[in-house]
């Protein structure tokens, strides 16, 4: 995960001080790209331990089209609690846009199903895209999408995915996002008969919050370790049939967890 540590170093070396909506303050750079080849291992950060359970359940929650935190809470995942209303609702965020994007005719488009169809029928298409940035519904979202646009690409039997992320909390959020979209890539490759290729992560405003600077320095002092391997249940053939028990992580030997307060 040298690419990730290089991002942190670049922000510290080149970043500018900026104010933000949370009032915390950041050091920020604009425009950065990382690339992870899944043949080299599953890109789960090793310079601090990550809570894989939260990553998996959040992704399954998105794929369900769910926008209420009750499903997450039932499984001990609390990462969205701060933005939910008293009923647990978050508005038309990721899951809704992925599975139920409103169309011009009064219906809805299941973007994930369309991706699966295109990969099977039109793998060379340049339109295999999922977008979460629905301008007409941003005001109803409790948190507008940070990771908002993905495109799939097939070459030589390998599936790659590029993600554009407009806002990148580089200490807390980015490690989760890397693992989540790498896992989504692996899952979609699995059910479409392709091999997982590269996850390309393109960042807009990549920042470190000022209250995370000590944690970042600690992380940069640690030597990265070998990447683990993610094994999927070979019996699962439908993307929406995956359950938590269908994922097995092998060889994960990270440094200890580093705590940080999320900026809300």
Curated annotation (Swiss-Prot):
EC number(s) reported in the record: 2.1.1.45
Example GO BP: methylation
Active site per database record: 146
Pathway recorded for this protein: Pyrimidine metabolism; dTTP biosynthesis
Pfam family name, one: Thymidylat_synt
One Gene Ontology MF term: thymidylate synthase activity
Chain residues that bind (6R)-5,10-methylene-5,6,7,8-tetrahydrofolate: 51, 169, 263
Recorded superkingdom: Bacteria
Keywords for the protein's UniProt record, in alphabetical order: Cytoplasm, Methyltransferase, Nucleotide biosynthesis, Transferase
Major location (coarse): cytoplasm
Catalytic activity: dUMP + (6R)-5,10-methylene-5,6,7,8-tetrahydrofolate = 7,8-dihydrofolate + dTMP
GO cellular component, one term: cytosol
Compartmental location: Cytoplasm
Binding residues for dUMP: 21, 126-127, 166-169, 177, 207-209
Family affiliation: Belongs to the thymidylate synthase family. Bacterial-type ThyA subfamily.
Subunit description: Homodimer.
Alphabetical list of PANTHER family matching this protein: THYMIDYLATE SYNTHASE, THYMIDYLATE SYNTHASE 1
Function statement: Catalyzes the reductive methylation of 2'-deoxyuridine-5'-monophosphate (dUMP) to 2'-deoxythymidine-5'-monophosphate (dTMP) while utilizing 5,10-methylenetetrahydrofolate (mTHF) as the methyl donor and reductant in the reaction, yielding dihydrofolate (DHF) as a by-product. This enzymatic reaction provides an intracellular de novo source of dTMP, an essential precursor for DNA biosynthesis.
Name the record gives this protein: Thymidylate synthase
Organism annotation: Porphyromonas gingivalis (strain ATCC BAA-308 / W83)
């Amino acid at each position: 995960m040298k690419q990730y540590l290089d991002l942190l170093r670049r922000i510290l070396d080149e970043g500018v001080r900026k104010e933000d909506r949370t009032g915390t303050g950041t050091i920020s750079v604009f425009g950065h790209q990382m690339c992870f080849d899944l043949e080299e291992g599953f890109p789960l950060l090793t310079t601090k331990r990550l809570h894989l359970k939260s990553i998996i359940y959040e992704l399954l929650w998105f794929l369900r089209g769910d926008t209420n935190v009750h499903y997450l809470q039932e499984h001990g995942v609390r990462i969205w609690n701060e933005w939910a209303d008293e009923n647990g609702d978050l508005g038309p965020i990721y899951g809704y846009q992925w599975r139920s994007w409103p169309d011009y005719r009064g219906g809805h488009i299941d973007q994930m199903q369309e991706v699966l169809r295109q990969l099977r029928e039109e793998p060379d298409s340049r339109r295999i895209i999922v977008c979460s940035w629905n301008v007409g519904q941003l005001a109803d979202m409790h948190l507008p999408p940070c990771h908002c646009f993905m495109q799939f690409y097939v070459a030589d039997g390998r599936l790659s995915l590029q993600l554009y992320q407009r806002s990148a909390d580089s200490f807390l959020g980015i490690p989760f996002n890397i693992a989540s979209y790498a896992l989504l890539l692996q899952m979609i490759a699995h059910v479409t008969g392709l091999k997982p290729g590269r996850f390309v992560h393109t960042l807009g405003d990549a920042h470190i919050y000022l209250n995370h600077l000590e944690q970042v320095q600690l992380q940069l002092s640690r030597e990265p370790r070998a990447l683990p391997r993610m094994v999927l249940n070979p019996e699962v053939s439908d993307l929406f049939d995956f359950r938590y028990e269908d994922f097995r992580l092998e060889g994960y030997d990270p440094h200890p967890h580093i705590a940080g307060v999320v900026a809300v």
